[in-house]
C-alpha cells in the first residue's frame, strides 16, 4: 500500500546498504469490545485498509449493529466487497476458535478482558499469528500528603467517570495517604453523590446505565464483598431501584487489602479508596 513506507539506511561499516520493505501481513482477525464499538473498530480497520489487508471483524455481541453500519458505510464509499467481513454471534468462542486456527489467518487483534486475551494467545500459538492485544487494566490513582485535595478530586472525577467507568483506561483504585484520606474521601463522595443518574437521552443526566444486568450484578458483587469485609460506602453502594441497569456512583472508604475490589477491574462507577502511610 502506498501509505506504508519502508526504510533505507547505510550499514555502520559503510560498505552495504540496508533496505527494509513493508508488505501487508495478510488476512487479519479483529475482535472489538462493546464499550467503544466504533472507536475500537476504526482504529483497527483503518490501519489494515492502509496496509492492504483483508479483515474478518467479530464485534461484541452486545453491540453488533455499530460495526454492521460501519461496514455498510465503507462499502458505500468504495471499499471493495470482501475486504471487510463482519461476523456477528453470541457464541464468540465457538465461532472464533476455528478462524484463529485457520491456516489462512495471519494476524489477530483483540481489545477486551485479560482473561479472554490469554485464551486467544493460547489458541493463536498453533499458527504463530502476529498479535496485537489491548487488554483490561487496573489503573491506580495516587494522592500524596502534599496534594491539592480539590485538584485531586477534580482529577479523580475525570479519571473514574469517563464512560461511567466502563473503560480500561479508567482509574480503578484510589490510593490516598492516610493524613488526607478523610478530606479527599468526603469531597470525592460529595461530587460522586451529586451526579444525576438516568437515561442518557434526558437533558442534565450525567450517569447512564451499565451495559447489561450481568455487568451491574458483577459491580454490586464487588461492592458488597468490600462492605462485608469492613469497607464503608460513603455514597451509593447499591443498584438504583427501578427499570434499567443503573448503579449509583459509589465511593468506598476503609477498603481492606482482603477485599476483591482493589485487585479487580470494576468496569463501573465505583471508586474504592484504600489508604497508605509510606
Model-predicted regions and their roles:
Residues 20-23, 43, 100, 168, ...:
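A generic fold-level signal
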Residues 2-6, 196-199:
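Short amphipathic alpha-helical interaction/hinge segments
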Residues 107, 115-256, 275-278:
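ALDH superfamily catalytic-core signature
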Residues 262:
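Short, solvent-exposed loop/beta-turn-alpha elements that line the ligand-binding surface or hinge
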Residues 269:
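Glycine-rich nucleotide-phosphate-binding loops and adjacent flexible coil segments
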Residues 66-70, 167, 265:
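Short acidic/histidine- and often glycine-rich active-site loop of Leloir-type glycosyltransferases
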Residues 3, 7-151, 276:
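Rossmann-like NAD(P) dinucleotide-binding subdomain of oxidoreductase/dehydrogenase enzymes
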Amino acid at each position: 500500500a502506498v501509505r506504508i513506507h519502508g526504510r533505507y539506511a547505510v550499514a555502520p561499516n559503510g560498505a552495504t546498504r540496508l533496505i527494509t520493505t513493508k508488505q501487508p501481513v495478510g488476512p487479519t482477525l479483529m475482535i472489538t469490545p462493546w464499550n467503544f464499538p466504533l472507536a475500537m473498530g476504526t482504529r483497527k480497520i483503518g490501519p489494515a485498509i492502509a496496509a492492504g489487508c483483508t479483515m474478518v471483524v467479530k464485534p461484541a455481541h452486545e453491540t453488533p449493529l455499530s460495526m454492521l453500519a460501519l461496514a455498510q458505510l465503507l462499502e458505500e464509499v468504495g471499499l471493495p466487497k470482501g475486504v471487510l467481513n463482519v461476523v456477528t454471534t453470541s457464541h464468540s468462542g465457538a465461532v472464533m476458535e476455528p478462524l484463529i486456527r485457520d491456516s489462512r489467518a495471519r494476524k489477530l487483534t483483540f481489545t477486551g478482558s485479560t482473561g479472554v486475551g490469554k485464551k486467544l494467545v493460547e489458541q493463536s500459538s498453533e499458527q504463530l499469528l502476529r498479535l496485537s492485544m489491548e487488554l483490561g487494566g487496573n489503573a491506580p490513582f495516587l494522592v500524596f500528603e502534599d496534594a491539592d485535595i480539590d485538584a485531586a478530586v477534580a482529577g479523580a472525577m475525570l479519571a473514574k467517570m469517563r464512560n461511567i467507568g466502563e473503560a480500561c483506561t479508567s482509574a480503578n483504585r484510589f490510593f490516598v495517604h492516610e493524613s488526607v484520606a478523610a478530606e479527599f474521601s468526603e469531597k470525592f463522595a460529595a461530587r460522586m453523590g451529586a451526579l444525576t443518574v438516568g437515561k442518557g437521552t434526558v437533558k442534565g443526566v450525567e450517569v447512564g446505565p451499565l451495559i447489561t444486568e450481568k455487568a451491574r450484578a458483577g459491580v454490586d458483587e464487588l461492592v458488597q464483598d468490600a462492605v462485608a469485609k469492613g469497607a464503608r460506602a460513603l455514597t451509593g453502594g447499591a443498584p438504583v431501584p427501578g427499570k434499567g441497569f443503573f448503579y449509583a456512583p459509589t465511593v468506598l472508604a476503609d477498603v481492606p487489602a482482603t477485599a476483591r475490589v482493589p485487585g479487580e477491574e470494576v468496569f463501573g462507577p465505583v471508586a474504592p479508596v484504600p489508604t497508605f502511610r509510606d
